[in-house]
């Protein structure tokens, strides 16, 4: 029987143009650029003027062009997101519609910030079954929709964006070699939006104002433990040591978590690709955006061993070992772009900030 693998043949990203800086946040929160940078590593984040599916579509078009295939070649679409345009139907179907794909399997996957790693594992195994030839794996979020802009601890962390990869079936031993995903359910309440969905009071007067539970110290401890143990597992399973890893693509949640993960794993911090300073935490989109930029900037070379690691609400966690193929250059480029935005980030958030502050003052 033929052994199939799922090579990453295309990569793309989409970042909305409106930039919300730390200084912008200090105009309506008790914070400062220094306070945010020293605690998180974040300097800016993006605020979207369009829906999550629009971000996902642009990232997908870039990935398709770089893979040198057409949308009609895709027979599987997985969108990792916890901020979809709608609950019913899924937004993978919207991406499929936007790309004018006639027939493909399409579904959303919610593992919060670990979503892309879960999606990559799922897509890879489906391709290895022999049933699919080309898959789009997308991480896309519009987290600004959820944020309580009167709550400093979370308002400074998150941003909007999308990243995508194309997986293509091959007999060469490249792509995701193995992964370890899991969930620490005892910590599910320390990072959550608990009253969104059927648990909410549908007719309550304050619908639309969701509590965002965030217990930072406990999240830090559990995140490092979950990612660290998953990373150790995939290396042991592959018979590799830390020295065999060329590049680490970690979830971009907090610079201190990234540094601690590397230190505990014995991996030099210089091997970790970091772009949290530009985009903040884009949840399921952080890993594919970082992967895309690592390729674009020449950090990933042909044949590299790449360690992915992430954690998220649930508390989900996961790591994966990717063997890069021989091609690091795009076959072609796409001119896909979002519609123009004529507002600043603060202008886009004006009503949300006012309403969140009014609720806090009640």
Curated annotation (Swiss-Prot):
Chain spans, region ACP-binding: 252-256
Keywords: Acyltransferase, Cytoplasm, Fatty acid biosynthesis, Fatty acid metabolism, Lipid biosynthesis, Lipid metabolism, Multifunctional enzyme, Transferase
Entry annotation: catalytic residues: 113, 251, 281
Catalytic activity, EC: 2.3.1.180
Classification via CDD domains: KAS_III (cd00830)
GO MF entry, a single one: beta-ketoacyl-acyl-carrier-protein synthase III activity
Acyltransferase in keyword set: yes
Catalytic activity: malonyl-[ACP] + acetyl-CoA + H(+) = 3-oxobutanoyl-[ACP] + CO2 + CoA
Taxonomic superkingdom: Bacteria
Top EC class for this record: transferase
Alphabetical list of Pfam families matching this protein: ACP_syn_III, ACP_syn_III_C
Pathway of action: Lipid metabolism; fatty acid biosynthesis
Compartment(s): Cytoplasm
Major localization class: cytoplasm
InterPro entries attached to this UniProt entry: ACP_syn_III_C, ACP_syn_III_N, FabH, Thiolase-like
An example Gene Ontology biological process: fatty acid biosynthetic process
Comment field on protein domains: The last Arg residue of the ACP-binding site is essential for the weak association between ACP/AcpP and FabH.
Family that this chain belongs to: Belongs to the thiolase-like superfamily. FabH family.
Quaternary structure annotation from Swiss-Prot or TrEMBL: Homodimer.
Name under which the protein is recorded: Beta-ketoacyl-[acyl-carrier-protein] synthase III 2
Provenance organism: Vibrio vulnificus (strain YJ016)
